[in-house]
Amino acid sequence: MRIEEDLKLGFKDVLIRPKRSTLKSRSDVELERQFTFKHSGQTWSGVPIIAANMDTVGTFEMAQALAGFDILTAVHKHYTVEEWAAFINTASADVLKHVMVSTGTSDADFAKTAQILALNPALNFVCIDVANGYSEHFVQFVAKAREAWPTKTICAGNVVTGEMCEELILSGADIVKVGIGPGSVCTTRVKTGVGYPQLSAVIECADAAHGLGGMIVSDGGCTMPGDVAKAFGGGADFVMLGGMLAGHEESGGSVVEENGEKFMLFYGMSSESAMNRHVGGVAKYRAAEGKTVKLPLRGPVGNTARDILGGLRSACTYVGASRLKELTKRTTFIRVQEQENRIFNNL
């Protein structure tokens, strides 16, 4: 046993210090980025935000809507091959370039993903997702996927430390998914005592990944557009959003009505709700590590996407970054004990 004395920080612990700027308008900010990935060699350009691979967020409908904003969607792994085929038959090539195919790490997952990727060559992204990216089996699966799909861009996680980030990149991942426990419907930290404050995880993993020519996606912990800006400021190449994109018309959650008001169910993918739906219940040897919440219906996701992108542009103007790529170079974090004036928050 040992204790690390270094203070680790989450998004709520900091603000971004404003700096002199020559920008005259938020419209001067370029949010699109272009990446060439280490292993696949593929080049992609767009806004580096990803809708999470949750079945109440990462839907085909979400992919269609967010492609119009140049945003990626990690489509959840529970669609059948037939459902994928039907989607591909109706989706444009532009939509498909904004889609990630999500998978687990079983032999059945591998075979199913191979079938999906064979449906259309425009599917260039694979998202290999497990709750705990520290297992040897997971690393071996990433290497297997890289060998099988050498030209596909592979995103793999989740981890929160530099050495494991390096391990995954060396095993074939182009992008490492960073985050254990920060999600709005994740209870891993409560159930297990395991986790890592998200901003510190992003900063440390970005440093490790960039040293090897890899990239990271900050997954979880964003509750408002300012958190997205902080994640990019901390060095994230991509930011994945779940709760911020849940509860919309395109989100895919079940709708319930109470006292004349409609709500949409949103749950973590290790929650009892998710396991009841997809694997027949919670196995006797494990505990659920997610919760289910009811969100007021929020309308089309386009309104939320515009709000997030507007906040991100504004953050860039406050530090003089004319491009999103420059934000991390111009970011100075200050530690704080408050984020906002909350006097009217309950009204």
Swiss-Prot record:
Residues the record marks as active site: 186 (thioimidate intermediate)
EC number in record: 1.7.1.7
Reaction(s) catalysed (UniProt annotation): IMP + NH4(+) + NADP(+) = GMP + NADPH + 2 H(+)
UniProt subunit comment: Homotetramer.
Molecular function, one GO term: GMP reductase activity
EC category name: oxidoreductase
UniProt keyword terms in alphabetical order: Metal-binding, NADP, Oxidoreductase, Potassium
HAMAP family attached to this UniProt entry: GMP_reduct_type1 (MF_00596)
Name assigned to this protein: GMP reductase
Gene Ontology CC entries for this record: cytosol; GMP reductase complex
